[in-house]
Amino acid sequence: MENFPIISLDKVNGVERAATMEMIKDACENWGFFELVNHGIPREVMDTVEKMTKGHYKKCMEQRFKELVASKALEGVQAEVTDMDWESTFFLKHLPISNISEVPDLDEEYREVMRDFAKRLEKLAEELLDLLCENLGLEKGYLKNAFYGSKGPNFGTKVSNYPPCPKPDLIKGLRAHTDAGGIILLFQDDKVSGLQLLKDGQWIDVPPMRHSIVVNLGDQLEVITNGKYKSVMHRVIAQKDGARMSLASFYNPGSDAVIYPAPALVEKEAEENKQVYPKFVFDDYMKLYAGLKFQAKEPRFEAMKAMETDVKMDPIATV
């Protein structure tokens, strides 16, 4: 079995740039996932985020989760649970408008820490998109512009905690799915594992590493690259021992962004008679995804293709 791709991002600025770009290319084409070290976000920032996130769960969310488990009688289930996940979550919006000031129960210091962390993640996401452009032969800024819409991208963080689960064989931490959006940056617990991706028909563990950022590609990048890069099914396995923290930050297209395969890539694919992906408004895709998240992505693409005659093709905004 191949090793999960772990990439030292600082090497794109040195003599190992070509080899590092090739590693990113291979990860995008063959895994849909990779793990970044030396990515530029200071370790002390990540340590503070982790400490405050775990503290917030203990203080404000742990008891609510226990009450939910009791109300659903989840600890006594005898058959596989297919309609809910063993996770405690809340969501922070950063772009186009932040909701961090409005989210209840957050200490002011935690709000400031998360604002700072979000800015660093936004910068990293945009840096990665440009590296993907370079590997794809697209002009710098193409993917950011493709995501832009009229108000800029949507960017937010899903903050999750996965408490110890008494029946991990029957309840998933998070059921298998692909991510609907663009590029996802995950800061996960380095002590408790659980994240797995599907590759060549096998579930593979994503290794927990201290101070790393796990990157995965969403459905929109599969469409824009016309299938050259793929979004990949992944899931979280609940654990009997240990609580797992996960902060997944989604850098997604703006709600009114029109998503379609990059013409330069379609021309290359056309020569090989490969199928062209659909064109659609991102918000329309999200409405469809809401009811089909835990199903295969291909029927979603087919449904959008059936609707695409109604989509106006506007030129990509320039930022």
From Swiss-Prot:
Fe2OG dioxygenase domain mapped to chain residues: 153-253
Domain of life: Eukaryota
Keywords, sorted A to Z: Ethylene biosynthesis, Iron, Metal-binding, Oxidoreductase, Vitamin C
Catalytic activity: 1-aminocyclopropane-1-carboxylate + L-ascorbate + O2 = ethene + L-dehydroascorbate + hydrogen cyanide + CO2 + 2 H2O
Pathway given in the UniProt record: Alkene biosynthesis; ethylene biosynthesis via S-adenosyl-L-methionine; ethylene from S-adenosyl-L-methionine: step 2/2
Needed cofactors: Fe cation
Enzyme class: oxidoreductase
Enzyme Commission numbers on file: 1.14.17.4
Gene Ontology terms for molecular function: 1-aminocyclopropane-1-carboxylate oxidase activity; 2-oxoglutarate-dependent dioxygenase activity; L-ascorbic acid binding; metal ion binding
InterPro entries from the UniProt entry: DIOX_N, IPNS-like_FE2OG_OXY, IPNS-like_sf, Oxoglu/Fe-dep_dioxygenase_dom, Plant_2OG-oxidoreductases
Annotated residues for binding of Fe cation: 177, 179, 234
Biological processes per GO annotation: coumarin biosynthetic process; ethylene biosynthetic process; response to molecule of fungal origin
Family: Belongs to the iron/ascorbate-dependent oxidoreductase family.
Cross-referenced PANTHER family: OXOGLUTARATE/IRON-DEPENDENT DIOXYGENASE
Stated name of the protein: 1-aminocyclopropane-1-carboxylate oxidase 1
Species, as recorded: Petunia hybrida
Lineage of producing organism: Eukaryota, Viridiplantae, Streptophyta, Embryophyta, Tracheophyta
